[in-house]
């Protein structure tokens, strides 16, 4: 990888407009994208990358999955409305022929990328004390001080547990909404392979 290009991507690709930074906008900075960007800069700017990784951990839900997008300006304001479920909201309420939800309203891959990002940080720095640091989980409408907290290690465990609890009949992770590829919107119950 080209360190300069990775640095530019991390700093600019998600921060170009108030549309992505803004307060409770319909968009925001992508969880998956940001986690991937951080892995590209971890070797030469691990402490700066860690700050964004902590922001990402703070928009992980107590169930273990993560909000698909968050707005950094709203996160700084701590208004309880700094993250959203991304495009999965478009399919909310769509029912199949049996009257059941046709699509997942959660993303099944976002929360797994932060596991890789934190692992990269630990490999680069050896600072295992990070695993003990407490970070709140995301609960819409609540300020950070009111939210459940967990160690970084607990966040990572819940990430893996969420995937483990969403397995299909063939032992493969169920696909959430737009998992691994923003254009994939398979019916609820589809398995990764």
Question: What do the predicted segments below correspond to?
Answer:
Residues 29-34, 38-173:
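Aromatic-rich carbohydrate-recognition surfaces in CAZymes
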Residues 1-25, 51, 55, 162, ...:
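Low-complexity, Ser/Thr/Pro/Gly-enriched N-terminal "stalk/linker" regions
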